């Protein structure tokens, strides 16, 4: 699995509930841009439209000198049952949304998007998460000094 782009900053302040894999419908120049690893997912999100999923605000950089729409909405490819299940969970849970976590090539060289059902964290949860992360870094540092 070769990662094209990750969405680290876009997931700050969110707690990941579950992850799914989806295909993506791309044009030829977008595939070439993905192979060149010039994709940005920072402010992107996923929305429902007529029972289908769409990726919005994902920036695929221009390939060569083509006049193209870089920030168009791209259709995500999932089974209908998975989409319905995801929509039901989104409606049932409060303050949840769907965000892309990364775009990658799978083992068959197909471009896939990993999407996550995420829930917004409040300020106290963010502080706890930062403390936990700092403690883990400190423990790793201490372990490396003794080994």
From Swiss-Prot:
Alphabetized PROSITE patterns for the sequence: SSRP (PS01317)
An example Gene Ontology molecular-function term: RNA binding
GO BP of this protein: trans-translation
InterPro entries registered for this protein in UniProt: SmpB, SsrA-bd_prot, SsrA-bd_prot_CS
Keyword hit for Calcium: no
UniProt superkingdom: Bacteria
Location of the protein in the cell: Cytoplasm
CDD domains: SmpB (cd09294)
GO annotations of cellular component type: cytosol
One Pfam family named in its UniProt record: SmpB
Record carries keyword Lipid metabolism: no
Keyword tags: Cytoplasm, RNA-binding
Functional description taken from the UniProt entry: Required for rescue of stalled ribosomes mediated by trans-translation. Binds to transfer-messenger RNA (tmRNA), required for stable association of tmRNA with ribosomes. tmRNA and SmpB together mimic tRNA shape, replacing the anticodon stem-loop with SmpB. tmRNA is encoded by the ssrA gene; the 2 termini fold to resemble tRNA(Ala) and it encodes a 'tag peptide', a short internal open reading frame. During trans-translation Ala-aminoacylated tmRNA acts like a tRNA, entering the A-site of stalled ribosomes, displacing the stalled mRNA.
Family membership: Belongs to the SmpB family.
Protein name: SsrA-binding protein
Name of the gene this protein is made from: smpB
């Amino acid at each position: 699995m070769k990662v094209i782009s990750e969405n680290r900053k876009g997931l700050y302040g969110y707690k990941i509930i579950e992850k799914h894999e989806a295909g993506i419908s791309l044009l030829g120049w977008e595939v070439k841009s993905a192979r060149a690893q010039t994709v940005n997912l920072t402010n992107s999100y996923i929305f429902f439209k007529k029972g289908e999923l769409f990726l919005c605000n994902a920036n695929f950089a221009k390939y060569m000198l083509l006049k193209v729409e870089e920030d168009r909405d791209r259709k995500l490819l999932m089974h209908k049952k998975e989409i319905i299940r995801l929509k039901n969970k989104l409606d049932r849970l409060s303050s949840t949304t769907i965000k892309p976590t990364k775009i990658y090539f799978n083992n068959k060289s197909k471009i896939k998007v990993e999407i996550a059902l995420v829930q917004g964290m409040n300020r106290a949860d963010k502080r706890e998460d930062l403390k936990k992360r700092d403690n883990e870094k400190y423990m790793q540092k201490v372990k490396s000094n003794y080994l």
